[in-house]
Amino acid sequence: MDTIKFDKERTLVIAHRGLSGIETENTNAAFVAAGNRSYYGIETDIHRTADGQFVVIHDYDLKRVAGLDIKVEEVDFSVLQEIVLFDKEGSKNREDLRISTLDNYISICKKYNKHCVLELKSHFTKEEILGIINIIKGHKYLDSVTFISFDYENLIKIKEYLPEQSAQFLFREFTEGLVEKVIADKLDVDVHHKVLNKGVIDMLHNNGLVVNCWTVDTKERGEELAQWGVDYITSNILE
């Protein structure tokens, strides 16, 4: 299996949860697979564990990825480390497919010179946000990180520590006053692709906003968005 190539114009492509169309999402294998391809960046999701570790996983529990009714934030990292995740065929035959850490993710992105698109999934405290920042600072890689979140307060906390840091608010549809709010808070946008057209993208650009969109997996839609000038496309399989 290979990625789907498309004419991306000047749009930058982000591998969603790593190259999750080919490898199990949010694993080191998915991050390395994306690292070995032409992606500009690699997106992942961060949760905290019961003992305060930062791990990369999308869901709040392990039902979908491992068939286990375990909530990520209610167990220590040592418990999560022992669990093998499903591969793309639904089996557990690969010992390497395990829950990774923020530290591992940053290391892989840095090795392959990929931009980090880091979704803050939990509702983090200021102290936890600072902990995440310090892990990235330890790799000297903050300049290559964009924070994203559906939780607006997470992004405000990022901006309190790092006023000039790249950060994008995730949302599914426009609401009254949203554009004005993100401009005031010096954020950019990461929006569901279905609400975008050329007029909307132009409006956002005219307001000085960087436009990321998710999750685009067909060649036709990817090329349409690229022709309209969207800045980033987040995809499971397009390259």
Residue spans for each PLM region:
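Phosphate-group recognition and catalysis centered on beta-loop-alpha active-site segments
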Residues: 1-239
